[in-house]
Every structure is written in structure tokens, then in C-alpha cells.
Amino acid sequence: MMELKMHNVKGTENLKFDAEVGKVLNIVIHSLYTNKDIFLRELVSNASDACDKLRYESQLNPNLLDSSGELKITISSNKDENELYVTDNGIGMSRQDLIGNLGTIASSGTQKFLDAIKNSKDSSQAVELIGKFGVGFYSSFMVASEVIVESRKAGEEESWVWRSTGDGEYSISKLDNQIPCGTKITLVMRPEENEFLDKFRIENIVTTYSDHINFPVEFIDEEGKSEKLNSKAAIWTKLKNDVTQEEHNDFFRGVAHVGGEPWMILHNKNEGAIEYTNLLYVPSIKPFDLFHPDRRCSVKLYVNKVFITEDNVQIIPQYLRFLKGVVDSPDLPLNISRETLQNNRVVEQIRKSLTKRVISELGKKAKENLEEYTKFWTNFGAVLKEGLCEAMPTEEREALLSICRFHSTGDKKLVSIDDYISRMKPEQGYIYYLTGNSLDSVKNSPQLEGFISKGLEVLLFVDPVDDFWTSVIHEYKGQKFKSVTRADVDLEKFSPEEKDKENKSDEERAEGNTDSILQYFTKVLGNAVKSVKISKKLTDSPVCLAVDEGAMDLRMERFLREQNQLNYRTPKVLEVNTKHSVIKSIIKSYAENGENPTLEDMVHLLFYQACIVEGEEMDDASLFAKKLNNLLGKVII
């Protein structure tokens, strides 16, 4: 390989960087980049831009390509000299280009070129180029003590060399002998950065950041043998119908790091006010770390096929973190280091557009094939419902809620809330639901007895996240949600007329006794309960716990206590089923014999029973066991 020291130069001109570049370089070198790998990404990206420019210019002037051959980028190293070389046969730079592009940190050759294209009448020839802030090149000084740039612009005869140690000055010289058109960058590496001279280190950086750029990136070893480093095609740039299922499967396995095929593919190109392409996959398998607190979204961000990051990406909301794939856009705003996204209007627009599209496609899947959608929901439904807890417009929340599926007392299959509403009784007025730890526990809950007996459907929520979203979402399409654990639930209006008259007659006959027994229950239980009421929803169980309207849900309160977010337990309402044989026996015994220790034990045991069923802690488990044993002993005797 021809080294710079073999060239003769003349007319060396020493210049100072504009815009106090010495200070800016200090920021770039020591503060701006957190990952030193970035320097090679930037140099390869710049080289790709140069090739793109030449390809575009050659459409207007074919002679520019005559001596260039295949457009490509080569990387090589010389460990003896401690030097790294990045070469391209792209458009190259003239003396003025070197001053304008490398001597002024606020300037950008690519941006100037893009501006020229935008002003051109021949807009159909527009080429995809990455907009830069003019600092990517200077990241080389993180690892190099000196940077040397040799370049000849396509179509021109003169060759130039630019060099700097990053101390605020640079020099430009004219080369006596002509070099091929394009640009060669030589980095004289700092001794502690010689790891970047290793072929495997270079290959890792290229495959990580530049695997999908338009041009071949080759490594040339010391014997002159070349090896192509970037191998993958950017299939998201193809037309949707041109990508085969096999290509999707291979690409999915590469970005998702899981086996199998994707459950759903979303491949779209948005050409509106904001331009972007997305190729997103929903996996068929739930990742083991889906609910790990440190797990982040793993959608890769590209800018015109150059990988930027997959950390801190705000393009996909956290509740869609199961998505895998890429988002590529020339309009994405980047901060000055290109390592993190700026939180601004463009990012938010892409996020909203993508989120809306994903929810829409999932909705179509749910309608087309419920069995297949159930597989998705089993894997990712709990994550999707996390989005219901986020602040969002009502329309967006209802769209998300519409694709949610739940267990129900009215159907063996998962149902949507729209399905539920379509089956509501005319006088119902509420979407009834019950939360619990498992499907079996909620199905056997006493809270459901009255609803089932009257043919009222109840949605069954069994994921921990259900406790949270039901506390912030109170209605859907004008229908209010109501937990069946609320003490003010009244099911009498759903009773058949004859049965209703019969129940009222029974209540009138027992009214005097029930008032006194409620007072007795309240006296025995004291501060352990907020109040004691006659239940209007129990049919088979003697008692249950309930909470007043507006109070915290039973399960939510328990969760907060378990997480040490709540250090007290609020007294609950005890509902009593006066039609149950046990309660009738207590009423009769109290009426005939008044207060007695056995009756008091029975009241305590009924309360403990209600606590156990709802998963509530008992203040004194030993007392419960003692009272139970006393009562059992009397029964056995």
C-alpha cells in the first residue's frame, strides 16, 4: 500500500480552524462520544456519502466513473507504523472542499450537497445521504494523535493532503503526483488505542454499525488480500412484495436473537411530512426477560442504513417492547454526537405514527383469526396493557383497549370489551369486572354468584397490571367500569318480577331480625370492618368483603402493601347473605338466646373466611385457629 510519506508535497499552507475549533475539538475528543467505536462508524459513513455523491454526479457526467471502477470502501492497518487507513473511491475533495468540510466544524459537505439537490429542478435524481453536524470526522482524534487526509476530486487533476493533530491548526499541501480520485484517511493511532488496528476489532465495528450501507466495505490484510466485512442486505429498503418469507425469517432471527418465525410482520414506508421506513416483527415466542425491569425496547435505529443505536430509542413506546426490527429515516433528529436521539417533534410524530399502525394491524389480526391472536395475547397481552396506564388521548386509549382480550364468565374464549358491550342487558349500565391472582381463583369467587345467577357477564382480569389500569380508566365508549367487589352493587333490578316480589316479602318478614344481627356483627368485629351490610349479590356464600365506591380496590391495596408503598390496611365492608343457612342459624340463635361465646366465635370465623377468600391477611391467625378448633370440638361432641 502506498504510504503518504512516499508522496512529494509543495506549497504547504498552515491554517487555523474556524469557530474556535480548538475548544470544540476538546469537547468532541473528551466529552462528546461515550463509545470510541463511533469514530470508525463515522469515517465509514462519510466514505459511503462520498460514494453516493459520485454515483449521483455520474448520472449527469458518466465520465466521472471511468477510472473509479466499483464504488467501495477499504480499511487496512499497519501495526508496525501504528496506522489505520480508511479509503474510498467516491467523489473526493478539492482544496476548497477540504477547507470548507474539514476546516470549519459547523460546516458539512453532505449538507451543502443535499441543499444543492433540493434546489435542483431534477428532484427525481435525489440520492439518500446522511445529514451530519460536521463533527463526526473529528471523532477520529479520540483515538489518533494525527489525522492525514489525501484526496482528489473526481473530474479534477490536482491532489491534496490535509493534516492535523487536533490542536487548533491544520495544514493543506498540494501533492506532486496524482492519486486516484477519492479520499484516503490515515490515522496515526495513540499507543493505547492500538486495539483498533486488529482486523477482528474492525470487523466487529463494521458489522455492528455499517452492515447495511450501500457499498462494499473491505478489509485488506498485510498480504494484500481483501475480505468483505459487510454482508447483510438492508431488506427494509426493498419493496414490501419483493421480500421473501425466507428473507424475513433470516433477518428476524438476526435482529431478535430467537429461533422460529415472526408471528407478524409490519413492513411500511411512510412518505408524508416525515419520511421513514419500518420493518418490525412480533415474535412467536415470549422472551424470558420480557418483564425484567432493565429490559428496554430493542428496535434498531438507522439513518439511511447506517446503524445509530438501539438504546434510549423513543421511537417505540415501552409497552410495545416485544417488537423487534428496524426503523430507518433520513429525517430523524440526532444530537451532535449521533449517539442519542433528541426528544423533539419529529421523533414524537414517528412514534405516534408507528404506534397507531401497530395497534391497527393487531386489531386486524384479532378480527381475522381469534385463535392465532390468542397465542399473541398469551405471550404479550400483559405488556400491551401497560400502555393503558400511560397518559394518552382518549381516542388512542380506546384504540389500545379495543385490541385487549379478557377472560369472561360469559364465554370460554377470550372476549373484547366491544363483545361484552354488545351482550349487555339493556338496563345494565356498567361493564362489570373482577380482578384476581389467577383464573381459577376469580372463577370461584363468591363475588360472582349473584351475577351468574342473573345472567350478567363479568370480565375476569388476572394480570397484575389490571389493578393499575382499572384505577385510571373509568369508562370505555361511554360505558363505565365497575368492580363487582363494590359494596353498592345492586342486582335486584335484574331479578324476575315474581322472584323479586318473593325476595321483598322474605326481607320484610326478617327486617327486624336482620337489623339487630347487623348491629351484633358490627359490635363483635369492631374496627376490623368499616360496616356490615346485607349483600345483594351473594347467593351461595354466607359472607364476602367489599369496598365502598371510590375506595381503593382490594387487590390494589394488597399489592401496595406488599411493595411497602402502603403501611396500613383499611377496614372493609362485610356483606352478609341473610338467605344463607349459616346466617339464618345465627339470626335464629341470636333472637332466641342473645349474645354468647359460640355465636361470637361464628361471627369471627365468618369474617376470617371472607378474608381468606379475598387473600386478605388476618391480624391474628392463632386466634382464628383457636376459635375454629373450639367450634369444631362442639360440633363433634
Curated annotation (Swiss-Prot):
Domain of life: Bacteria
Region annotation B: where it falls in the sequence: 339-558
Record region (Disordered): 493-512
Subunit structure: Homodimer.
Coiled coil regions, renumbered to chain: none
Annotated function: Molecular chaperone. Has ATPase activity.
Underlying gene: htpG
Protein name per Swiss-Prot or TrEMBL: Chaperone protein HtpG
Primary location recorded for the protein, binned into one broad class: cytoplasm
Sorted UniProt keywords: ATP-binding, Chaperone, Cytoplasm, Nucleotide-binding, Stress response
GO molecular function, one term: unfolded protein binding
Protein family according to the UniProt entry: Belongs to the heat shock protein 90 family.
Stored SUPFAM superfamilies: ATPase domain of HSP90 chaperone/DNA topoisomerase II/histidine kinase, HSP90 C-terminal domain, Ribosomal protein S5 domain 2-like
Compartments, record wording: Cytoplasm
Thylakoid in keyword set: no
HAMAP family, alphabetized: HSP90 (MF_00505)
Region annotation (C) ranges: 559-637
Residue segments, region A: 1-338
